[in-house]
Design a protein with these regions (language model features):
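Sec-dependent signal peptide recognition
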Residues: 2-10
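Aromatic- and Gly/Pro-enriched helix-to-coil junctions and flexible linker segments
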Residues: 20-148
């Protein structure tokens, strides 16, 4: 037993945050409240309403509502699978090398990178795949952790 404890400590130091440790409730929601809520909160229209009048909502800085775990993962593993990765990527995984258009909302400078890292850890090892709408395979979607 005595030997096991240092081994465990070394293990947790090497992997400071495994995907299972990052949850929507503990890490993503507070980040979302800070960075995304003003345009995707309760005052934003549900997705199907948003789609009917995109232009008007966009002019008003309103995107589709994502104010619960369920409405958020809709853009991750649901009908809009992968949208979150497409929008938040910093450009290192996109075809044209340009960041997704929500990346800039993740904060300034270092904070932006750190917040992206939290999102990536939440999605899980190997699951941050940037592909077009409808292009993620079932296997790729199944890799997504996104713990509640
Ligand atoms: C200043 C307002 C604003 C902020 C802040 C903002 N968004 Fe957005 N977002 C929009 C608008 C408007 C759209 C719809 C237009 C578009 O598709 O680009 C959108 C679209 C999206 C989409 C695509 C939805 C779809 O149709 O598939 C995702 C995903 C997204 N945002 C995630 C986020 C996340 C995560 C954050 C916080 C890090 C965030 N946004 C912050 C305004 C914002």
């Amino acid at each position: 037993m005595k030997k096991l404890i240092p081994a465990l400590l070394a293990f947790s130091a090497a992997f400071p945050a495994l995907a299972d440790d990052i949850t929507y409730a503990k890490h993503i929601r507070p980040l979302w409240d800070d960075k995304c809520e003003r345009c995707h909160g309760t005052s934003a229209p549900p997705y199907e309403v948003f789609l009917k009048d995109k232009k008007t909502f966009e002019l008003d800085d309103k995107g589709p509502r994502m104010d619960s775990y369920e409405s958020f993962v809709f853009f991750l593993t649901g009908p809009q699978a992968g949208a979150l990765m497409r929008r938040l990527d910093d450009g290192s995984n996109t075809k044209d090398g340009q960041p997704g258009n929500m990346y800039r909302h993740l904060g300034r400078g270092e904070q932006r990178k750190e917040n992206l890292q939290i999102f990536k850890q939440w999605i899980g090892e190997g699951a941050w795949i940037v592909k077009g709408a409808g292009e993620l395979s079932k296997d790729e979607i199944q890799k997504i952790k996104a713990a509640k």
